[in-house]
Regions:
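Short beta-strand/loop segments at the ligand-binding rim of alpha/beta enzyme cores
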Residues: 187-198, 222-224, 229-238
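Gly/Ser-rich catalytic serine loop of serine hydrolases
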Residues: 199-209
Length: 296
């Protein structure tokens, strides 16, 4: 006989709420609307309310651009922490944390495949990995992509999505500005097209190097493009900047960008430009840039 079980009523088990994923709902930076992430995927992370372009993860960016399957190129290994840098935490610890969070080795991926049936190589940066900052690994990636383009006689496309140079690598990071500039110039000297795609943001050392050297500059609607940010400029010159300053549309009006497109228009626009620059016919009559729906 157990008096606890016989005379004391068992307590009702406390129910615990189910855990909700952190990224289930996203707030639109443009209009403040709460957006269901599952619905956002259908629009390639463009707000259906105001049309604001939220940042797109690297793998989704590559999926958006290529016709179907694409092959990622293996990038040369670089020394992880040549300066033994430490601020509030070790640089090596930061790298480990971002690799775990993004699943990527660094802020760049280089892939080859077809866009509208035209073979090309794409080097894309990822803001989710340390703000897409350009260090030695990113520099190596751009150089690798350029060398691959020259070797296989195909166009080079870069997709900038970066806050600039990586401060944890100091002068070694700034050196990549010269290296990437030389790399894309090599592509041009070989008579091959180089298309620079700019997304939000394209700033700092990336905008001051390869990102602004394309034969054609294509920017996503509303993206920030510049060297220093508008807030820094206003604090320095102590003047209010013009409305829309450093946005894609402003740069197009002032001759720094050739084409401004929405995300859904990006691939069809690239196909048209590639077909003109390579003198190739587009293999597909219509290029779809919407995510494929799962077949039932």
């Amino acid at each position: 006989m157990n008096w606890l079980s016989d005379f004391v009523r068992p307590k009702i088990k406390k129910t615990t709420p189910k855990e909700i994923a952190d990224d289930l709902w996203l707030k639109c930076p443009g209009c403040g609307e709460l957006l269901f992430s599952k619905e956002l995927k259908k629009t390639w992370y463009v707000c259906p309310k105001c049309g604001h372009h939220l940042r797109l993860y690297l793998d989704k960016r590559l999926k958006l651009l290529f016709d179907g399957a694409h092959t990622e190129l293996e990038l040369p290994e670089t020394k992880e922490d040549p300066l033994k840098f430490r601020d509030s935490k070790k640089y090596t610890d930061r790298l480990k944390a971002y690799r775990k969070a993004t699943g990527n080795q660094d802020a760049i991926k280089v892939a080859t495949g077809t866009i509208g049936g035209i073979k090309c190589v794409v080097a894309a940066l990822d803001f989710a990995f340390m703000g897409g900052s350009m260090g030695m690994a990113v520099g190596e990636g751009i150089v690798k992509a350029a060398e691959y383009a020259v070797k296989h006689r195909i166009p080079l496309i870069t997709v900038a999505n970066s806050g600039g140079a990586r401060m944890q690598e100091g002068i070694l990071s700034l050196m990549q500005m010269a290296r990437t500039t030389s790399a894309v110039n090599m592509v041009k000297e070989n008579g091959l097209p180089f298309i620079s795609v700019m997304t939000d943001p394209t700033t700092g050392g990336v905008s001051a190097s390869f990102a602004m050297l394309g034969d054609i500059h294509i920017a996503e609607k509303g993206c920030l493009i510049g060297f220093a940010g508008p807030r820094v400029i206003e604090q320095t010159i102590r003047e209010k900047l013009p409305e829309g300053f450093q946005r894609a549309e402003y740069l197009r009006e002032h001759g720094m960008v050739d084409i401004v497109v929405t995300r859904s228009e990006m691939k069809p626009t690239l196909v048209k430009v590639l077909s003109i620059l390579t003198h190739q016919k587009i293999e597909c009559a219509m290029v779809k840039s919407e995510p494929a729906k799962n077949k039932k």
